[in-house]
Amino acid sequence: MLSVRRRQEDARGVGLRGGAAAGGMEDDAELEEGEACGDETAFVDPDVALSYIDEKIQDVLGHFQKDFEGAVSAENLGSKFGGYGSFLPTYQRSPLPQTRSPPKAANVSSRSPYHQPTESMSQNTLAVAAPSVSKHNGSMVPLSDDSSKKEVHQSTKVERASSTQDSLNGLSKSSDHNRFKVRIKVGSDNGLARNNAAIYSGLGLDISSPSSIEDSPDGCGSLSPEFNNVPIESPRTILQIMTCFSVPGGFLLSPLRDDLVQLTQKVVPTSKKWETNANTENVQERYEGYAAKRVKSDAKKKKAVDTKRSKSRNDVSAVMKNEIDIETPAGQKIVLEALNIPLLSNPRTMEAKDGSQFEEDPMRDTLVENKDARLKERTINSDLMAIKYENVKAEAAECLENSGPGSSGMDFSAVKGEVKFKAEKAEIHVEDRNTTSEKDFQSDRKQERKIKTESKCNATGVNFEGNKVMNERTPVVGRSIGKVSSKETLLNDINEENVSKSESRRSQKEQNMNASSSSDFLEDDRGVLSSGAVKERKNDSQSKSSHPGRKPKAKSHRDVREHLPEGSYGGKDDTLENGSGLGELRPKKIWKNDSERDSDMPGTSKREISSSLKNDRHTPAEEQRMHVPPSVSAPTANAAPMLPAPVVIEEHWVCCDICQKWRLLPYKMNPSLLPKKWKCSMLQWLPGMNRCEVSEDETTNALNALYVSPAPGNGVASVGHSHVASSGLTTSNTLNVNGHVEQSRKRKNTLSDGNVSFDVSQQMQGSVYPLSNQHAPIRSKSAADSIQFPVERDSKSVDHFVEKKRSKSKNHGSSSDGGHLVERSKKHSKVKSKREMDHDEYRTSKKIKKEERRQRQSGIDSNPGYDLASGDVPDEAKALPSKSMALQGSSERSDVPPSKYKSVSKYNSSEKSKRSKDGDVFLPEDKNKEHSYPSDAQKPDLSSKKRIVKEWEESQHNSTPPVSKMSIVNQSSSSKETCKDQNLKETKSKLTKSEEPFAMTDSKSIKVAHSNQTSRNLNNELFEDSTPFAVKSGMSEPPENRSSEQALDLAEPASSDLAYFQTTAVTSSSSKASGSQRRKQNFHVAKTSPIESVSSSPPRISNNDKVSHDKILGKDGSTCANTNNMQSLVKNTEVIVDNVRQARKSHESMLASEPVMNGFSQGNSDKDNELPQLTQGHASNGIISGRSLDDDLQHASGRKDSSLKSSNAARSHNHLHYANKNNLLTDGSSIQHRMAVLDTKGDSMVHENKRSVTSLQDRNGSTHYPPDGNPQSEVSFGKEKSHPKSNKHDMQNSKAQMLPSPLKESKVESHSAPLRSNASKLTAQLKRGNVENGGQHGITKQAISNPADTSSPVRKDNNSTGYALKEARDLKHKANRLKEEGKEQESTRLYFESALKYLHVASTLEPPPSIDGFKQCDAAQNLYSDTAKLCNFVGHAYEKSKKMAAAALAYKCVEVAYLKAAYYKYPTASKDRQMLQAIVQNPPGESPSSSASDIDNLNNNGLSKGPSSKDANSPQVTGNNLLLAARNQPHLTRLLAYTNDVNCAFDATRKSQMAIASAASNQENGIDGLSSVKTVLDFNFQSVNDLLRLVRLSMESISC
């Protein structure tokens, strides 16, 4: 029989053993290192015992007898092989007869597919065969007894191997040095011992050198030269022939099958081979019964392995020799038997068992054959091996491609000839190892893989892929084995695998960093590394395996997977790793794919392995498919409907220079075309989202929504994808590549390196689904996308991506975005493509698959909480944020924490202060964006993620590019509103608690009126003038920004505004259209400027103007009420409709105006109620749009809740009251408080932080100026006390009023604070009305309780302006009282003095010359207009009293006031004129901006209807048609306002000239007096203060 003996035994004089050798071996299995089997076998004479067999064998298998080399013997093969080798195929597959060195030859053979089947044995077999077996082996007649015994021994050996593998380090050392000499002796156990030389010669095994391999200097033992020339008929070859080839006339009876070889090949990953080398040697030795020798060899081998490792990867042969033992079919069989694992008849069967689909098996077989051929070639020449390595690389690539569709690990092994070869050995070893200790081998293999990957990492992904493929194959084998093998083995393997994985990852990372030529590494790794490195790795892995408790980082991922549902951990992660094209890391993971993971990868949790085994969701092919995106379509058990090849979308982001938020550019937009300085207002592709207030998530989601439909219809909601992309979050539940893609995209994809995704994205990003900061997910993004998914199956991939993202420095704080996939760090680069093709593809496919799987596995994955909980929604960002990204482009975003988190924090009082500090204040939305897009870095709570995702989906559904603000608001707000509303509520509550009306974050000085003061003022005064406004008096944003924002606001309100309130629009009592949009505007106000939002086109300004105007002035021209707020009004560029003042396009100005409205007097009750009671009606030149300030405030607060809470809650309808000459003062009821809320909540006011915010308290919030002498009824907050009762007192100077005086809402929400008796007086006065041209100015009774309270942020000293305003109001109130008492002359003088004071205040509100005054002159414009009306009233009174000189001065003041107002309206008027020219060309219903005009028309129609319905007595009612037309054409309205101011100024000039002429003719005041008057009339309007000084001098000269 054949027996394997060590030279040591020979030295010891151990004789040839007969059948008793089996028993000896049996004993050997239990022997410790250094111990030898009993020598009784030496006395067995095979010639005598088996003499009759020799002839038979010679006759039947003569040419094969020489194949019984190395560790392979009849004994080893056992009875199943027939004991005699009689079942071997008639034709032999001879490995190349010559190898460079015996070790090399051994290695080559082990690499050969032949050896792969008996992976474990082949390694040892090589070692043994090399030294002892010659080409011409004598006939071998193994005894059946011996073989059976041998099998027993092998099983025991296997057991020992498992135990010994724990101590592989020592064993490997001994195995390295202890080489087996294969001796074939024929004879019975009892037969006389034959001379060794005779036996060898008879068998053709003439080997002169008795020295053992272990004696070789290299520690691997040198093979005899004969061995080098050993033909392909090595034991390994024989085993392969037995298993793989049929005997002529029929198939082999051998139990071994082709699949066995393939199986071993599967198991063979180099790491396994390496591990196997050490383990296999031990096992082989056990098999042969030379435990002692094996031990020795192992001890030496360990050293040798290290030496080899250090020496050269080329010394594969030596290592392979060691490996041969196990690789031999006998060894493999033994291993299987020891494990009680039925030999796999077919890899497919195995796969079926594993649950994995081994469609690759046929391919494997072919590959295996090819492998065999290649192996032979390698055997012939190591050089050829190197060449083959190259071939293998190509093949590996092919295998990967094939495997992607569904080829099994076999294909991989086939692809990599060497790898397969090694894999075969490794597989055999794995089997042995499984027998002995799969974990050890697995860990070893892992280590080998690590080592290979390390060397190969530098090289190329192909190496990794090849290794991966091998690994995958190996996992398949290991998996099947693992199933059979005890869980402990799996656990050990897993642990080892984890260790090896972590090491491999580290090594791979290092290698990646140090990447060298891929081809070299491939060759070296496959060839040289396979044996030496493998051994080393085995040793390492064994040592590691011996410390399974030590789990590598990689393990953590697997651990996560372990916790994940079984099906989930596999393909996805691998796919992510592999598919991601993360060459090095993925190869490891790939190799560890389900099968490997299951059996080979200790890193993989048992559960994971078992799940793969049980669920078999991912076959290696499946994993490969996952790895290979193109092949994703390959049918896999897990595969959801085949995903279309991921569409690689180059995602570009642009960063706003103002808000630093990232905006996803349309996929085909070239970022290079963008201007250097880019602002959110330039975001024209999303009509309603071109505001800084809009969060990144919103814009990303909206944009992605446009591209969602293209997403594969896998049943995955496009919204979900885009949302996921936006958030950068992926559902870990789905194992599909889509999930990977999704994750990858998460970030915030947003990943700077292009690995978006996550979000974040990466995101996934991750934030949640877009959590912008997910986000990041997203995108996060987020980077992770920094989100690690709780779900284990995704955890690996996710971790991998996260690592990548992190390594790639995904900046998603959120995720990707920021919280955004695009973090602040990304700010430096405005435009960047966040996602790479690979990531996009993988993300997309993974995302889709995940969705599909989620749907399919609703039972398992349906739990959205699970997905979210698992962190599948990475981005977060990723959403996206990674940033939120659509399947194609959105990311991150991934991984992104829910926007609400940021928003919440922003809403904090500290945030308020921050806003005040920061010139630019971002609304919670913006913050939310950051949060959402933090896709990346920040993980929102899962619940928050879920919510965000849902919201995002909703927003997506609604996010169709909003045509109008309303629609947008409804859409985006639906998603964000919840979080934002909550945030706003919290903020609001905080603000209310703090009683801070609002903090305007103004780049300029901000004076916040305390709500207490405001309330006191309100309580004390109805008069608007007395209450300070909280307004941003600072410069408004540049007009370009404003205009762009305004245009955008039309659609913009959607996301940010909606977030705060969707219902608000409905809530406002004022015209629903305008109100809703107003809310949007207010929301914008909170974010940008509420006014703009009202109408996308400039007309929207009119609404804001109303607010601001009302706030600023009692329409009557008692501008004082809001004069404190004038600056804030100034910010409101919008012109009051009355005054035809347009709000400046800039949102800031609009915001400022609204804050002003909100800033109107707020009583404590207001604070308590949080009710801004606003009577809003601006009669600008008779055009009055009344809009409830409450609505504005509500909008500003950004909440429906912000609607007035108390009885005041009844919103004053936008009553456009036109008191004939009576301008109702807008009562800004606790607007200020509301505004404060707005500011804190939204940046509506703050957003215009650039402008200094003046907090003016409108005590009564309204001042009444009789337009053209008409007293305005003032509405007290608690009451709508004053209606323009003096309609009879329509201005006789109606002509002076081109349009009705500013409208005031007659209706004012009741204010809890009692009105002062003055209010009643005022009411009485109003009732009386002035008969004269200037009816009494409706004077709000409230006296300013405290000048300090009324301080307003004026560019000049706030206090001085406040005092001046207070004095003007006091004078006006006093004049009203005197007029009621019938003292007309005194009252007229006081009115005039009051008008002069108002002019002074208006002049102080003018922006400095250095500043673009046209942007900030709303307050001044409004005050000038109202003052002009008051002056006109005074002039009319003087004319009646025949004081023509005084009348001339009054009219001069009217002229100056109107000219000043027109002066500041001119820039807008000029544009409007141009627009009107175009409009004239267009059909009446159309305007240059259709969307804006639509909204404006809607709002304007409602507004125009409001005035007519509310004040039927108003002269404007008659002008309704005109008003409607004007409203429909905001440009026309503004132009008319401008024209009206100019006309009024010229009319006043004419009147003054007539008056002075009349005075001169009458010579009533003497020459000096007339001269002074003449001087005044000749004075220009530029220097108001100088003019006022001259007027006072003239008044004294004329004794008036």
UniProtKB/Swiss-Prot annotation:
GO terms for cellular component: nucleus. Its main location: nucleus. Zn(2+) binds at C656, C659, C680, C692. Changing W653A: Abolishes binding to histone H3K4me3. Residues 92-126, 161-173, 510-520, 957-976, 1010-1020, 1090-1105, 1172-1183, 1252-1263, 1342-1353, 1487-1517 have a biased composition (Polar residues). It is found in: Nucleus. Residues 25-38 have a biased composition (Acidic residues). It holds the Pfam family THD_CWZF3-5-7. The keyword Glycoprotein does not apply. Transcriptional activator that acts as a positive regulator of grain size. Binds directly to the DNA core sequence 5'-CATTTC-3' found in the promoter of MADS1, and activates MADS1 transcription. Increases grain width via direct up-regulation of MADS1 expression. Promotes active chromatin modification at the MADS1 locus by increasing its level of histone H3K4me3. In GST pull-down assay, binds specifically to histone H3K4me3, but not to H3K4me1 or H3K4me2. May facilitate the recruitment of effectors to mediate gene expression. This is Cysteine-tryptophan domain-containing zinc finger protein 7. It comes from Oryza sativa subsp. japonica (Rice).
